[in-house]
């Protein structure tokens, strides 16, 4: 899955690294040329770890069966819930519970890690 007319995001669900491989997040983030980029880095049991390099806003969505964890590496991430906005700085994380309408925004280029179930659809249900 990559950018399309409905969702102009670069989303790569292929797993980039296997066990016993070094993952260089900084090199991947520095090489990113997109405003909204999501790359699956590795699989850990039934979950995946994804790198997001983001600027702008994602659409409102929810995941009916899956929680979603966001962790900021660099920049600031805003997570909008229906009546609340969470602001995350580097080294801060937040879990959005399953079934919760949300969207993420970044006013500046921001690098994040996401941990979610292997089969999750990133754009929501």
Which sequence ranges carry the predicted segments?
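Short strand-coil-strand connectors
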Residues: 45, 80-84, 107
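Conserved short histidine dyad/triad with adjacent acidic residue
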Residues: 34-35, 48-64
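Ligand-binding loop in jelly-roll beta-barrel domains
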Residues: 98-125
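Short, conserved beta-strand element in jelly-roll/cupin
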Residues: 53-54, 63-80, 115
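A short, N-terminal "cap"/entry segment at the start of jelly-roll beta-barrel domains
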Residues: 1-50
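A cytosolic small-molecule/anion-sensing beta-strand core signal
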Residues: 45, 73-74, 89-90, 108, ...
């Amino acid at each position: 899955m990559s950018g399309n007319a409905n969702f102009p995001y670069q989303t790569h669900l292929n797993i980039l690294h296997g066990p016993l491989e070094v993952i260089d997040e900084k090199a991947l983030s520095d090489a990113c040329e997109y405003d909204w980029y999501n790359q699956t880095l590795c699989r850990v049991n039934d979950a995946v770890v994804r790198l997001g390099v983001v600027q702008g806003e994602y659409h409102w969505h929810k995941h009916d069966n899956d929680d979603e964890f966001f962790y900021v590496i660099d920049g600031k991430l805003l997570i909008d819930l229906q009546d609340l906005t969470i602001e995350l700085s580097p080294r801060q994380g937040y879990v959005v519970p399953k079934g919760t309408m949300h969207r993420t925004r970044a006013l500046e280029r921001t690098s994040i890690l996401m941990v979610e179930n292997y089969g999750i659809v990133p754009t929501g249900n």
